[in-house]
């Protein structure tokens, strides 16, 4: 891969975008088209970032549905716990990401190309993905799919959705939602050496 060009946008906070050259973007698109159908079927239904037929509007509609259910059709209070994985793209661990991908992809040529894409950018040794690559969005979903599975299946939170590194859990009990912070923080720390 060739070096990235970079620029800043405000979305609403400043974000540093790294743009691959055209040749590398064609490769990223090809890798995305190979990996997406394999991993898409592993994601929870309520993951909304950069997925076909999902996105912000679908995520907001689903959140409103969760709030309606938690409030018994707006007859009682409902609460939402919004969490954000701290410095998510900057601190994605390359080794962990590549291990997660290798669980489903066994073709060595494909894995070599994926490794080259992942390792073409870093914010610290072995860490970070660039904002701006089509593959980065898919890699983010692959990386956080384990968190999604933990929240949905281990913590039994059915009214939960995620958009990239932000996720929201809805319920009718504020204290019950607040009590979820520590097990999620512990999961992130143990699995990814990360925090909320």
List the predicted regions and their residue ranges.
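A short glycine/small-residue-enriched secondary-structure motif
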Residues: 2-13, 40
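Conserved polymerase palm-domain catalytic core
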Residues: 3, 46, 66-196
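Active-site flanking loop/helix segments enriched in acidic
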Residues: 8-17, 125-131
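Structural motif
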Residues: 18-26, 105
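Charged boundary/loop elements
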Residues: 37, 41-46
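Basic, flexible linker segments flanking DNA-binding modules
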Residues: 50-52
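Duplex nucleic acid-engaging cores and interfaces of nucleic-acid transaction enzymes
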Residues: 56, 60, 64
């Amino acid at each position: 891969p060739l070096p990235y060009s970079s620029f800043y946008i405000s979305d609403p906070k400043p974000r540093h975008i790294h743009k691959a050259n055209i040749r590398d973007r064609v490769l990223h698109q090809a890798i995305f088209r190979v990996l997406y159908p394999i991993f898409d079927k592993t994601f929870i239904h309520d993951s909304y970032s950069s997925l076909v037929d999902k996105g912000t509007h679908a995520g907001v509609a689903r959140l409103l549905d969760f709030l309606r259910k938690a409030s018994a059709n707006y007859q009682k209070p409902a609460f939402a716990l919004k969490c954000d994985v701290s410095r998510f793209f900057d601190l994605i661990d390359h080794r962990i990401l590549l291990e997660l991908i290798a669980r489903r992809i066994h073709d060595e040529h494909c894995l070599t190309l994926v490794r080259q894409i992942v390792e073409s950018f870093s914010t610290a040794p072995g860490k970070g993905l660039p904002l701006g690559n089509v593959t980065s969005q898919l890699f983010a979903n692959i990386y956080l799919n384990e968190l999604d599975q933990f929240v949905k299946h281990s913590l039994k939170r059915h009214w939960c959705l995620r958009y990239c590194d932000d996720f929201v859990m809805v319920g009718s009990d504020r204290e019950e939602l607040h009590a979820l912070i520590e097990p999620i923080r512990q999961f992130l720390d143990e699995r990814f050496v990360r925090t909320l």
